C-alpha cells in the first residue's frame, strides 16, 4: 500500500511541472535567491540549541488559515526550487497547519517552522552571500515558504543527491527536515558519513526504509512526522 501511494506522489511531479509554468509570474513575489551549489557544513534545520532533544510542537491557534491562501506562493516556490508542490503543502500542514504566526519553543517560526540558525542560516550562506534573515522576514509567508522550500531542495540535491532511489531520498529529506540531517544519520544509521548513509540506504527497499523511519527510528516525533507528511502529501497531490 505504501509503495503504490508513494510512487504516485513521485510520478505526479512530471505532470504537475507543466501546470507550474503558468505560475511563473508569481515567482517574482519571492525573495531574490538564485539556486547554486557550494560546500558548507551540515546545519540542523532546528538550530543548535537542543538538537538531540524531542522538538516541541508550534503554537497552533484557531486562527490557522486555509491552505488556498498560499497557493500562488507555493506553486511559484515549487517551480523555482524544483520541489513538489504537494510536499510543500504537506510540510506546512504538519508544521503549522497554515498558521503564519506559529512559533515553537525551539525557536522555529512561521508556516514552515524556520529557525534563524538552521534552515535560514543554510539558505543565507548558499544563496544570499551570508546575509542573514531577520525574524520579521522569516515570519513573512512568502519568504518563509521560499526558505523552507530552498532547504528541502538543498537536502534533496546537495546532501542526499547520491541516494539513487527518488522515493527513498524523499523519505530521508522529510525526516531530515524534522530532526536534522546529522541526527538522522547518527540515530538512524549510526554514522556521520554521507557516503556510509548512502551505502546503508542502498541496502534497503523503499518499503523497508519507510518502516525504519516510521517504526524503528528512536525519535518519536520524527517517526510520526514522516508518516504524517507522507499521508498529507498524498492528499495534496491534486492541488
Name each region found by the language model.
Residues 47-100, 142-145, 157-163:
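Export/targeting segments at the very N-terminus of extracytoplasmic proteins
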Residues 109-113:
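Metal-dependent catalytic core segments for phosphate chemistry
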Residues 116-120:
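Short glycine-enriched loops at secondary-structure junctions
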Residues 100-102, 122-124:
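Activation segment
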Residues 82-101, 114-115, 148-149, 173-179, ...:
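Short, functionally critical alpha-helical segments immediately adjacent to catalytic or ligand/cofactor-binding
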Residues 105:
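A conserved mid-domain beta-alpha-beta active-site/ligand-binding segment of alpha/beta enzyme cores
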Residues 1-11, 121, 128-150, 154-239:
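Non-catalytic cell-wall polysaccharide-engagement segments
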Residues 2-75:
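N-terminal export signals and maturation junctions of secreted/periplasmic proteins
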Amino acid at each position: 500500500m505504501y509503495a503504490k501511494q508513494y510512487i504516485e506522489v513521485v510520478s505526479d511531479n512530471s505532470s504537475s511541472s507543466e501546470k507550474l509554468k503558468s505560475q511563473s509570474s508569481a515567482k517574482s513575489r519571492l525573495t531574490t535567491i538564485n539556486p547554486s551549489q557550494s560546500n558548507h557544513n551540515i546545519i540542523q534545520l532546528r538550530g543548535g540549541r537542543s538538537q538531540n532533544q524531542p522538538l516541541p510542537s508550534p503554537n497552533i491557534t484557531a486562527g490557522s488559515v486555509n491552505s488556498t491562501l498560499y497557493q500562488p506562493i507555493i506553486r511559484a516556490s515549487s517551480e523555482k526550487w524544483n520541489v513538489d508542490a504537494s510536499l510543500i503543502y504537506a510540510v506546512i500542514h504538519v508544521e503549522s497547519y497554515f498558521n503564519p504566526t506559529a512559533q515553537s519553543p525551539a525557536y522555529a517560526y512561521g508556516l514552515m517552522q524556520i529557525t534563524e540558525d538552521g534552515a535560514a542560516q543554510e539558505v543565507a550562506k548558499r544563496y544570499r552571500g551570508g546575509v542573514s534573515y531577520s525574524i520579521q522576514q522569516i515570519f513573512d509567508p512568502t519568504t518563509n515558504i521560499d526558505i523552507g522550500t530552498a532547504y528541502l531542495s538543498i537536502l534533496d540535491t546537495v546532501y542526499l543527491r547520491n541516494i539513487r532511489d527518488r522515493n527513498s531520498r524523499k523519505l530521508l529529506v522529510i525526516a531530515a527536515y524534522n530532526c536534522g540531517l546529522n541526527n538522522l544519520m547518527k540515530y538512524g544509521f549510526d554514522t556521520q558519513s554521507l557516503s556510509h548513509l548512502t551505502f546503508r540506504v542502498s541496502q534497503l527497499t523503499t518499503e523497508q526504509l519507510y518502516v525504519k523511519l516510521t517504526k524503528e527510528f528512536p525519535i518519536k516525533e520524527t517517526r510520526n512526522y514522516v508518516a504524517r507528511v507522507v499521508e498529507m502529501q498524498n492528499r495534496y497531490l491534486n492541488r
